Amino acid sequence: MNRKRLSDYGIRVGCMPTGPLDKITDVPGVTVGHATVRDARHHTGVTVIMPCEDNMFAKKLTAASFVLNGFGKTAGLVQVDELGMLETPIALTNTLNVGLVHDALVTVMAERCAADHVAMHSINPVVGECNDSQLNAIVDRPIHEAHVREAIAAACRDFDEGDIGAGAGTVCHGLKGGIGSASRQIEIAGKTYTLGVLVQSNHGCLEELTVCNRRLGEEIIAKRNARPAPEPNDRGSIMMVTATDLPVSDRQLRRIIKRCSVGLARCGSYFGHGSGDVMIGFTTVNRMPAGGMHRVVAQQVLTEHTLELAFRAIAEATQEAVLNSLCCADAVTAEDGRVFESISQYL
């Protein structure tokens, strides 16, 4: 697997400072794990974002979502939008495996709640997806509960990117896409906060691919000469997951994650008809206890004008995360013989 990230090519996105790993896991407590299925017919998997180590159902996280273009099948967003809370890990997989992964998260959380003596009669798993059928026999639905458990068990801070987990079969801007991540740190009132982004990139058309103002897609098309013309439409979807330790409300968090679209546009996406562009975000502070014993819960939130730095940071992190998903992915040959090249050979 190619481990070179965008920064390893001497390319820097923006000017804001990154976290130590420049990944979503720079937010304290957040870990990420993958399970991958790779054989002659399948390039697919599941990626799980673990927001914390403790029981999320017992102490829910403030969360929000925003759908830029709704050509997608993500599960769990209705309740996230209504209540502003997240109560399970976030899983990413392929489109037709959403149901099986959803069921696996229910089982995993039911076991956790039973072990912690926490009553659970209903739960809202969040599962995002991209259609990886260009490289994966998607109707086979090869991802099962064991893969979800494998991804959770593998969750760590310094996780792999590229064609792994939920990114094993994705195609981004006509090249091999995958999982990518980045982070930015901001200072407010003398305290440092982190915003991290993880993407599952499966969107865009080659012609529009832009790397820090360089029209790389057009260069690639020119170098290919007589090769077949690339797919002209921006379709296929991208999942964007934001984590932060900022003290914000779910409404403020929604304002922040909307700015992921800025980073996406900087890479050349115009959010086409067939692209499901979905953003999910959570903060690790302002937790909400489950049950009806607490009538009043005190929380701290930033003033609105303070969010300006967060808007800028999330745009930079998303842009870099998309480019890292491309840089870290190796070329893959589809079952029908089509080759989806790695961007690394053109940088």
Which positions does each model-derived feature cover?
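Alpha/propeptide regions of enzymes that mature by internal proteolysis
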Residues: 1-347
